A protein has these predicted regions:
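Long amphipathic alpha-helical segments
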Residues: 1-3
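Single, function-defining residue in the core of a domain
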Residues: 5-21, 33-54, 63-192
Length: 192
């Protein structure tokens, strides 16, 4: 409680300077992982945070609800968020997702909330790879089938073209679709 009272009296600029010093220090640190990628690996995700409407009227999204959305682009080489945005809780994940600038040659992993075929085309044009879950009702055509390693759980490896009217209008790029079976749970997953 004594420390809390002392901290309460410090100027906000002190904490801002401390944050930037810590960030600079940790930006150049590397985290050891069990996996290795030659390309920079990023995770992109957004979290919906419920707030008290009586305390945070500025975050009102409905008559009785307040919330905000926190979007983060995490660099896995040092486990530090390189991109952070806080927005209105009603905002679609893609609004901030499109704004993040990933370096060419990197790989970005994101969930199904980031479905935007034009964005996929832009990432591909910038030489940025991505991995996301494949929507099961997606309309596509198989262009080519590749050899698979069933012993590793890979059931299908296909080059596909999304060919729904929506995907064609937004110039969805040619994509790679991987179907995988988790050996422990037996569950099937499809990825782009």
């Amino acid at each position: 409680s004594t420390l809390a009272r002392i901290n309460e009296q410090q100027p906000a600029a002190l904490y801002q300077q401390l944050f930037h010093k810590l960030l600079k220090y940790y930006e150049h640190s590397k985290v050891a992982h069990k996996f290795r990628f030659k390309n920079p690996l990023y995770s992109l995700d957004a979290s919906h945070i419920d707030l008290s409407l009586s305390l945070c009227e500025w975050a009102k999204v409905h008559d009785s609800k307040a919330s905000m959305k926190l979007s983060i682009g995490l660099n896995h080489s040092n486990d530090i968020p390189e991109f952070v945005a806080v927005e209105n809780g009603k905002e679609n994940d893609m609004v901030q997702g499109r704004k993040f600038q990933f370096p060419a040659g990197s790989i970005v992993v994101f969930d199904k909330g980031y479905v935007d075929y034009q964005w996929y085309a832009n990432l591909t044009a910038q030489n940025i790879g991505f991995v996301t879950r494949f929507r099961p009702k997606s309309v596509y055509q198989v262009i080519q089938q590749h050899p698979v390693l069933e012993s590793k759980g890979i059931l299908k490896d296909e080059t596909i073209q999304l060919n729904s009217a929506h995907a064609l209008k937004r110039k969805a790029p040619v994509l790679r679709r991987i179907e995988y079976r988790d050996q422990q749970s037996g569950k099937h997953f499809s990825f782009l």
